[in-house]
Every structure is written in C-alpha cells, then in structure tokens.
Amino acid sequence: MAHQAHSYHMVDPSPWPIFGAAAALLTTSGLIMWFHYSSTTLLTMGLLSMLLVMLQWWRDVVRESTFQGHHTPTVQKGLRYGMILFITSEAFFFLGFFWAFFHSSLAPTPELGGQWPPTGVKPLNPLEVPLLNTAILLASGVTVTWAHHSITEGNRKQAIHALTLTILLGFYFTALQAMEYHEASFSIADSVYGSTFFVATGFHGLHVIIGSSFLTVCLLRLIKFHFTPNHHFGFEAAAWYWHFVDIIWLFLYMSMYWWGS
C-alpha cells in the first residue's frame, strides 16, 4: 500500500478472500465425500488449504497493523463495529438451533412417543461432564479477562500466563466434549433429539476450536511484543468472541443438557 494521507481503511488487493472461499468449498465438499464415501482425501486438502490461507491472511493483517501502522483509530473503530456485527450474526445462527430444539421439545409428536426426551433415548447426565465443561468455560472467561487487564496495565508476563491458561482450558473443553460424544448412548441419527443436540453442541464445539486458534495467534503476537496497552484490538476481538462462546454454552447447558434431560 502506498503512503496514505488519511486515516480510513483502504486495503490492498488481496488473493486471500477468493482462496479462502475455494478452501471452504473444498472443505464442505470433502465433508460430503467423507459422510457418503468414507474418503477423507478432499477433506484433508480443504483443511490444509484453509490453514494456509488463515496463516497468510493473518500475516498480512499483522504486517498492516503492527509494522505499517495502517490500523489508525478510525480503522480500529470500523473493525470493532465489524466484530460486533459478526458476533450478532453468530447469535442469530445459534438462535435457529434453539428454535428447532424448543419447537420439537415443547410439543413432542407421536413419532417421538409424545414425550421429551423421545422414547428410547437416554440423555446425558447434566451433573457430570457437561457441568465440568461449564466450569471450565467460565474459568476460561475469567482468565481471558485477566489477560486483557494485564495487557492494558502493561504487565506482559502476567498476560502471557493468563492467555496460555485460557488456551489450555479451551483445548481441555474440546477434549472432554470429544470424549462425551464418543461415550454418548445416542447418535445424530436418533430422532430430532440427536439431530438438534449434536448439531448445536457440535457447532459450539467448532466455535471453541476457532476461538482457541484465535487466542493462540494472539499469544504468539503477545510473545513477539505486537500488543501495547493502547493498541491490541486483535486480542480484544478474540476476547469478545471467547465471551460469546461462553454465553452460548450457558444457554446450551441450561436448555439441552439440564432442562432437555
């Protein structure tokens, strides 16, 4: 980008949006191939392509913000609005899953045995692994806030410790969720209960993985001295996203695990 005499967000032409779209197409096509033909070749190609695009796109954004100084206060304001709108759209995305769940559970059809959970489905105990996962995500919300306060106070060492702990809690949550899926007595094919449960909690789990990846990039940037007390929107966006994931989990726990069981 040539030298600019204004504070507005004018980006260079970038190949990453179209490459990202192609990688997403490969990934979703690969999922279909995996589901129907048990072939993971296309899915692996899609995931690797997506990872490469993410790394190079992040590299460009880091260069523009940290080294070229293009993320002026005006640009940061626009990025904040963008992140708020993105999180709002994600909230409506999950609203659809809650709608499907309550539509099915509040008036169970004769095909479900006229009851909820449906006949033959043994729900998970909400006081076991789900409760532990709730405690883990709430604790991670505390540690990410601790990291944010440490950055604003210029305490880099403490921020690194807090952010590392947050990431470890995120991966611990993912491991427990995978174990829970493996040990569940029902599958995604077991009536509308299995469908809504696995789709809603599965997409939430995907968001936890995305948030953990986002925070990991922030940790690497923090170690490399990219953040200052006044200039750390990359971390702020990741923290907002992480708090959103926390809140969605609380609604999932209260509705699908506790009330729905």
Curated annotation (Swiss-Prot):
Entry similarity comment: Belongs to the cytochrome c oxidase subunit 3 family.
Stored InterPro entries: Cyt_c/ubiquinol_Oxase_su3 (IPR024791), Cyt_c_oxase_su3_dom (IPR033945), Cyt_c_oxidase-like_su3 (IPR000298), Cyt_c_oxidase_su3-like_sf (IPR035973), Cyt_c_oxidase_su3_a-hlx (IPR013833)
CDD domains: Cyt_c_Oxidase_III (cd01665)
Assembly with partners or alone: Component of the cytochrome c oxidase (complex IV, CIV), a multisubunit enzyme composed of 14 subunits. The complex is composed of a catalytic core of 3 subunits MT-CO1, MT-CO2 and MT-CO3, encoded in the mitochondrial DNA, and 11 supernumerary subunits COX4I, COX5A, COX5B, COX6A, COX6B, COX6C, COX7A, COX7B, COX7C, COX8 and NDUFA4, which are encoded in the nuclear genome.
Name listed for the protein in its UniProt record: Cytochrome c oxidase subunit 3
GO MF term list: cytochrome-c oxidase activity
Coiled coil: none
